[in-house]
Curated annotation (Swiss-Prot):
Gene that specifies this protein: Acp70A
Keywords: Behavior, Disulfide bond, Hydroxylation, Secreted, Signal
Function (record text): Represses female sexual receptivity and stimulates oviposition.
Lineage, top ranks: Eukaryota, Metazoa, Ecdysozoa, Arthropoda, Hexapoda
InterPro entries listed in its UniProt record: Sex_peptide (IPR012608)
Listed GO CC annotations: extracellular region
Residues bearing PTM Hydroxyproline: 28, 32, 34, 38
Signal peptide: 1-19
The species this protein was found in: Drosophila sechellia (Fruit fly)
Localization per record: Secreted
Disulfides per UniProt: 43-55
Biological-process GO terms, alphabetical: regulation of female receptivity, post-mating
GO MF annotation: an example: hormone activity
Tissues expressing this chain: Main cells of the accessory glands of males (paragonial gland).
Protein name, UniProt field: Accessory gland-specific peptide 70A
Length: 55
């Protein structure tokens, strides 16, 4: 019984770690912290060419 509960806790922890890794892996593509071009940011916000959102 003890080994089963430990196994379940480990599985839950692994699931949490994997679910927490996903946003971190996706974040650089969505919001680049060192943005090379500020126009890129406005373009992603879909503000249009008037706001420098030229793609």
């Amino acid at each position: 019984m003890k080994t089963l509960s430990v196994f379940l806790v480990l599985v839950c922890l692994l699931g949490l770690v994997q679910s927490w890794e996903w946003p971190w892996n996706r974040q650089p593509t969505r919001y680049p912290i060192p943005s090379p071009n500020p126009r890129d940011k406005w373009c992603r916000l879909n503000l249009g060419p008037a706001w420098g959102g030229r793609c």
